[in-house]
């Protein structure tokens, strides 16, 4: 059993991810509604060091084509905030919302940014358990249809329900499931595909180059206007 556990938290709803992290760590830290930088949180749970990385959200039913490039890069680079790498990815899914085909495709595309091997490290975290009413989670998965079932299958049928209104409830059970993921993966943490890393590096360099070009263009335009007397330099 690993004494330290490292996890990256993914999902399309900021509040839900923050609640899951607070539940695990026993904190009451509010998360910014919109953020594009991954945030590292640490805590001690039953004598074990827990590191959780909260990542930027994507829109629930949007393709990666509609997600900002900076958000996609932050998702992929989030694994570097918990070196040497996360043991598990916690995919947060709100039970109060219908799970559509678009939602499934969006999840598959955004997790696909990490490479195919991510699926052997994913646990689905279901929140808003009050929405189950008299259903069991197994009945809910069945009733939601093929799209949710496909995600569960790709995750190796690993899932956990969190009553985020009751702090600490279900945390110990989740840690046992995370230990199970570590065991299944022979104690190895997740490592990003080299091809994906090169792709991210290339896109980041392209973004930096475009930003540099824009800055140069603005500076040149300002100098031209200053020479013409249309603007005055700030003192």
Locations of regions flagged by a protein language model:
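A Trp-anchored, charged/polar loop motif used as the substrate-binding/catalytic surface
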Residues: 72-74
């Amino acid at each position: 059993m690993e004494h330290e556990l490292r996890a990256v938290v993914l999902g399309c709803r900021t509040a839900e991810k923050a609640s899951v992290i607070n539940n695990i760590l026993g904190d009451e830290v509010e998360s910014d509604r919109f953020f594009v930088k991954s945030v590292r949180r640490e805590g001690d749970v039953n004598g074990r060091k827990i590191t959780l990385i909260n990542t930027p959200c994507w829109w629930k039913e949007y393709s990666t084509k509609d997600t900002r490039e900076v958000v996609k890069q932050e998702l992929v680079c989030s694994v570097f905030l918990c070196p040497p790498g996360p043991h598990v990815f916690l995919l947060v899914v709100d039970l109060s919302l219908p799970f559509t085909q678009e939602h499934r495709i969006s999840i598959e595309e955004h997790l696909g940014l990490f490479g195919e091997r991510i699926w052997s490290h994913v646990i689905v975290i279901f929140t808003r358990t009050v929405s189950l009413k008299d259903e069991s989670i197994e009945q809910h998965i069945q009733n939601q249809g093929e799209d949710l079932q496909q995600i569960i299958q790709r995750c190796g049928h690993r899932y956990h329900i969190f009553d985020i209104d009751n702090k600490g409830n279900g945390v110990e059970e989740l840690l046992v499931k995370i230990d199970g993921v570590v065991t299944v993966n022979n104690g190895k943490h997740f490592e990003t595909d080299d091809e994906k890393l090169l792709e991210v590096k290339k896109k980041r360099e392209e973004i930096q180059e475009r930003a540099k070009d824009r800055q140069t263009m603005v500076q040149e335009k300002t100098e031209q206007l200053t020479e013409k007397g249309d603007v005055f330099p700030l003192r």
